[in-house]
């Protein structure tokens, strides 16, 4: 544990280079296969922003009922504080692969705050078929396979199995279970290094997937000695099972809100933020690759300059596709459709409908930092954070014929003295266009401290936001007008 905390502190201070040294000529590891893989069961401890939050476990075994096939079982368990709530997360995956690590079948289960999502499927010669179940809803989907397809878990094995050598780059098509997307993973073998942060020497491998980069130091025998993600904010290192599982004790004693501390964009005070109708804001260190979905923003070098004006109409567009039910907002689900109609009895306009939905949610859905996969999860638990509120509002509104989309960005938090990442809605009002609505704050017209950055509700659509967290800073902000 001491090693992990030391690594995190050093890397966040920008001194990583002084802790890694060239280890001389790299050896050529012996050829290895899944059958000869030396480590069948590995545990790692996970640290986020200076606090131990969980562990991971990876097992490799021959498939009992399928000769010549192998199973990679992966598990990640985490516990952390967020906005005063004790959050528990468990990710479990079983990938069945061929001897060359290409994917054959898979079964994933994601559990957050008691809500579950399951993804199961198989990869054929040209098509990947899978089913997603969450909140009582299910979707069957297919994706086209154009080249050999690997599970994300195979990335830990591929460098060694394909002949690890400094200066080489490999590209693989990977199915990413958390986002249910096929994406290209790029792996560079960068160096052969030693470090006081781990024993011996190891190959430094940089992996890029879905715009995110992790760096792993892999020993000659295939063990992942150290791994860094989110620019060093997440650190994992090998531990024995007893030490890895001890995170439960440490997490129960941890009262720091590590997630808020890491993600908060500190800013000067904004008085009465929920009444701000026009605001200027400049964000520093904004990634050039991030496609901002906001007509009120413009790029100037590595800055994003935005004017949010609630008197100006939002961009127009075809709203009809935002009536369709989705896994996150299953507007055709009976319990959602029936309740929406009951809430809306007697309404004579879309504006009145929106007001009634917000009033009902304010009275019946508690505002707690509890995650959900679907609007049905929120309705049954009667509590949610901002994303869950946006899911439920979208499901209600779509069930009543109001095109509604889910958007993401930042909004000012008075208790925290800065901007937090936030999710809200935009509802289509005939003759006016898109209107920002925030069910968390009960706003039929969201205030101008809401800075929309990206639209979307699926995990795949939201991945780009991860590159902003802990990186972007507020250079200046000014509230120009209030209601």
Task: Give residue spans per PLM region.
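Acidic/charged, solvent-exposed loop-and-adjacent secondary-structure segments enriched in E/D, K/R, S/T
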Residues: 132-153, 357
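Acidic, serine/threonine-rich low-complexity disordered tracts
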Residues: 16-125, 160-315, 459-483
């Amino acid at each position: 544990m001491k090693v992990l905390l030391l690594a995190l502190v050093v890397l966040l201070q920008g001194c990583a280079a002084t802790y890694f040294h060239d280890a001389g000529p790299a050896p050529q590891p012996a050829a290895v296969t899944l059958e000869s893989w030396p480590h069948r069961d590995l545990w790692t401890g996970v640290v986020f922003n200076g606090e131990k939050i969980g562990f991971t476990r990876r097992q490799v075994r021959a498939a009992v009922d399928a000769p010549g096939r192998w199973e990679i079982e992966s598990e990640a368990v985490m516990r952390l504080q967020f906005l005063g709530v004790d959050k528990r997360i468990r990710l479990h995956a079983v990938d069945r692969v061929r001897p060359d690590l290409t994917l054959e079948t898979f079964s994933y289960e994601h559990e957050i705050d008691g809500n579950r999502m399951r993804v199961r499927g198989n990869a054929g010669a040209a098509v990947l078929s899978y089913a997603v179940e969450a909140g009582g809803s299910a979707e069957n989907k297919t994706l086209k396979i154009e080249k050999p397809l690997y599970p994300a878990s195979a990335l830990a094995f591929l460098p060694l199995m394909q002949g690890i050598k400094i200066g080489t780059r490999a590209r693989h098509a990977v199915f990413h279970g958390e986002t249910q997307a096929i994406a290209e993973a790029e792996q560079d073998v960068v160096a052969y290094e030693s470090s006081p942060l781990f024993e011996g020497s190891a190959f430094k491998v940089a992996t890029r997937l879905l715009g995110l980069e992790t760096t792993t130091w892999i020993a000659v025998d295939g063990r992942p000695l150290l791994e860094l993600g989110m620019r060093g904010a997440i650190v994992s290192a090998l531990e024995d099972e007893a030490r890895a599982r001890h995170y439960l004790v440490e997490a129960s004693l941890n009262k720091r809100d590590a997630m808020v501390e890491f993600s908060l964009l500190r800013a000067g005070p904004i008085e009465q933020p929920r009444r701000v109708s026009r605001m200027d804001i400049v964000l520093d260190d904004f990634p050039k690759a991030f496609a901002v979905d906001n007509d009120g923003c413009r790029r100037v070098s590595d800055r994003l300059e935005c004017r949010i004006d609630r008197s100006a109409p939002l961009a127009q567009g075809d709203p009809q596709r935002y009536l369709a039910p989705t896994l996150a907002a299953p507007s055709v689900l009976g319990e959602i459709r029936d309740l929406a109609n009951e809430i809306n009895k007697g309404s004579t306009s879309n504006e009145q409908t929106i007001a009634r939905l917000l009033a009902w949610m304010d009275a019946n859905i508690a505002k707690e930092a509890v995650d959900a996969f679907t609007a049905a999860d929120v309705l049954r638990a009667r509590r949610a954070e901002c994303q869950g509120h946006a899911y439920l509002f979208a499901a209600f509104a779509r069930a009543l014929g109001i095109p509604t989309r889910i958007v993401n960005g930042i909004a000012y938090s008075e208790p925290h003295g800065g901007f937090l990442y936030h999710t809200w809605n935009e509802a289509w009002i005939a003759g006016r266009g898109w209107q920002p609505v925030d069910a968390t704050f009960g706003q039929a017209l969201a205030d101008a401290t809401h800075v929309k950055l990206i639209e979307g509700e699926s995990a795949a659509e939201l991945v780009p936001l991860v590159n902003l967290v802990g990186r972007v800073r507020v250079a200046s902000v000014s509230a120009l007008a209030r209601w």
